[in-house]
Amino acid sequence: MKKLLYVTVNSKPEDQSASRTVGRALVNEILAEYNEFQLEELDLYKAHIPRLEYQYFASRNCMLDKEALEKLPPKEQEEVHQIVKLCDQFREADVVVIATPMWSLSFPAPLKEYMDCIIQVGRTITFEGKMPKGLLDDRPRTVVYVQSSGADIMWMMNPFFNKGLHYIEDMMKLMGIKKFDDLLVDGTGDTPEEKEKAIEKAKNKINGIVKHLEFEKE
């Protein structure tokens, strides 16, 4: 079985969230198109995402080994285990869908905390000399970033407004993931009509994304 990981970053119920509504439609179409996928869901507003503390690391981005870990208090050991679990869940996925609103030209804080957890030496990156190198180029993977925003963002303003999108894309490349798609739900506006129009416009792009997912075929 292939693994599809669906990460949501919005405290709103799905039927009130444009990003989650479109994200769900994308996930459903992936599952309909490729029956070899098993779905795992991670709600970053409900899951425990540990805050990284210096005592959890042997060196930069490198978690403690078993012997050093056992010297920590039980609560801190649990935090380290959760960080490793989140990282392993991500790297085991063949396709990852992240659904989030744009906040303050970026995204809600839980997504940054999650990214900090999954950037780990020996799991998703390594260092060759002083330069980082991604480890997730061992097989084809795809990440799709679904982002909602109230305004229609013109292409020439994309570098300024879509800082969150570009950050996530850069982090995926850092980890070695080459296939990255965005699905933008722009112009959700202030009225139900504007929101529905933006959702439907984004949904019309789903089929093209699904047809071109890259993952290791059986």
Features from the language model and the residues they span:
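N-terminal beta1-alpha1-beta2 submodule of the flavodoxin-like/Rossmannoid cofactor-binding fold
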Residues: M1-T100, L105-A109, E113, N204-E218
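Cofactor-binding loop segments of dinucleotide-utilizing enzymes, especially the Rossmann-like FAD-
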Residues: V9, S148, V185
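Short histidine/acidic/glycine/proline-rich micro-motifs that form metal-
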Residues: S11-E14, D152, G189-D190
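Glycine-rich phosphate/pyrophosphate-binding loop and the adjoining helix
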Residues: N28-L31, M154-E218
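Short, well-ordered coil/turn elements that cap or connect secondary structure elements
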Residues: Y34-E36, D138, I177
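Helix-loop-strand module that forms the ligand-binding subsite of alpha/beta enzymes
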Residues: E76-H166
